[in-house]
């Protein structure tokens, strides 16, 4: 029997999302075999959906489906990346995506309702919280999509051009994550905020300089900010000598919209202090 070390318990905890003591017991039962412990924990089915409903699900997968004139981009979350790689989770995501695409759903609410029974069954089987988080459907003359692994997805709608161009621009979106379509969408508040940040970060460099020099420095930073934040003004990742907007224009196309999803984006993940948890468990055991 392999020794049940703290490192082994920590690894099992990170891979399954279960509590420290549950992981320790599972390892003891499995004779220190972490893979067997995982299989036993999944097979036990003792962890119910209700128990896991409050747990933060910030891992998971992005999925996308397109037919060239429409697309659905979907995010489904799990507690651990381990589950996101399992067939049961992948099947749930695939079935959810197919339903959303076939029914032309435009938001997640009806999909969440119709898939609730399947979600609860998955949670009961795998012992993790699972959530359908968000969904976007787009339509247009030309629609392209790109999926990077199962963690980042992007869709682009064009007027004119072809699917290959739309897909290439979607790949650029996935790589660069622009904030705006073009600089006209950038609000005065956003520009003012960028200006203030620049002034704070460069206070020492600016001190004592003539007003016109400072103004030129600010304008240079704002110009750079607009280029970095705007899709049409970004350098195309596959050919940095060409801006994305120019690429589309040369192909007789206009970029209408883009959507970017990244797994767990905006979800606050709990920060685990493993040493503190061990100390708390030991203290509780002594009482």
Swiss-Prot record:
Keyword Protein biosynthesis belongs to the record: yes
Keywords linked to the UniProt accession: Cytoplasm, Elongation factor, Protein biosynthesis
Family: Belongs to the EF-Ts family.
HAMAP family documented for this protein: EF_Ts
Protein name: Elongation factor Ts
Residue span of region Involved in Mg(2+) ion dislocation from EF-Tu: 80-83
A GO term for molecular function: translation elongation factor activity
CDD domains per record: UBA_EF-Ts
NCBIfam families, alphabetized: tsf (TIGR00116)
Keyword Protein biosynthesis: yes
Organism ancestry: Bacteria, Pseudomonadati, Pseudomonadota, Gammaproteobacteria, Pseudomonadales
Organism for this UniProt entry: Pseudomonas putida (strain ATCC 700007 / DSM 6899 / JCM 31910 / BCRC 17059 / LMG 24140 / F1)
Disulfide bonds: none
Biological function: Associates with the EF-Tu.GDP complex and induces the exchange of GDP to GTP. It remains bound to the aminoacyl-tRNA.EF-Tu.GTP complex up to the GTP hydrolysis stage on the ribosome.
Principal place of residence: cytoplasm
Pfam families in UniProt: EF_TS
InterPro entries: EF-Ts_dimer_sf (IPR036402), Transl_elong_EFTs/EF1B (IPR001816), Transl_elong_EFTs/EF1B_dimer (IPR014039), Transl_elong_Ts_CS (IPR018101), UBA-like_sf (IPR009060)
Subcellular location, record wording: Cytoplasm
GO cellular component: a single term: cytoplasm
């Amino acid at each position: 029997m392999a020794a049940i070390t703290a490192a082994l318990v920590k690894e099992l905890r990170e891979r399954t999302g279960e509590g420290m003591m549950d992981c320790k017991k599972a390892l003891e039962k499995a004779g220190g075999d972490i893979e067997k412990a995982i299989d036993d924990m999944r097979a036990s089915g003792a962890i119910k959906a209700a128990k896991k409903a409050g747990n933060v699900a910030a891992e998971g997968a992005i999925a996308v489906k397109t037919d060239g004139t429409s697309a659905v981009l979907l995010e489904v979350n799990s507690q651990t990346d381990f589950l996101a790689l399992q067939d049961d989770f992948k099947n749930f995501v695939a079935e959810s995506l197919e339903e959303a695409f076939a029914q032309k759903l435009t938001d997640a609410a009806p999909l969440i309702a119709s898939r609730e029974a399947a979600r609860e069954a998955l949670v009961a089987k795998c012992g993790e919280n699972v959530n359908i988080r968000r969904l976007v459907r787009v339509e247009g003359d030309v629609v392209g999509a790109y999926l990077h692994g199962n963690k980042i997805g992007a869709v682009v709608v064009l007027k004119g051009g072809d699917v290959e161009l739309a897909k290439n621009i979607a790949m650029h979106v996935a790589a660069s994550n622009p904030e705006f379509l073009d600089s006209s969408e950038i609000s005065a508040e956003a520009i003012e905020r960028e200006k203030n940040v620049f002034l704070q970060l460069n206070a020492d460099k600016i001190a004592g300089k003539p007003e016109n020099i400072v103004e030129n420095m600010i304008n240079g930073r704002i110009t750079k900010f607009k280029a970095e934040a705007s899709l049409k003004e970004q350098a195309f990742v596959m050919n940095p000598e060409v801006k994305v907007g120019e690429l589309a224009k040369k192909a007789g196309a206009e970029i209408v919209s883009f959507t970017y999803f990244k797994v767990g984006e905006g979800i606050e993940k709990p920060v685990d202090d493993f040493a503190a948890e061990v100390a708390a468990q030991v203290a509780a055991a002594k009482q």
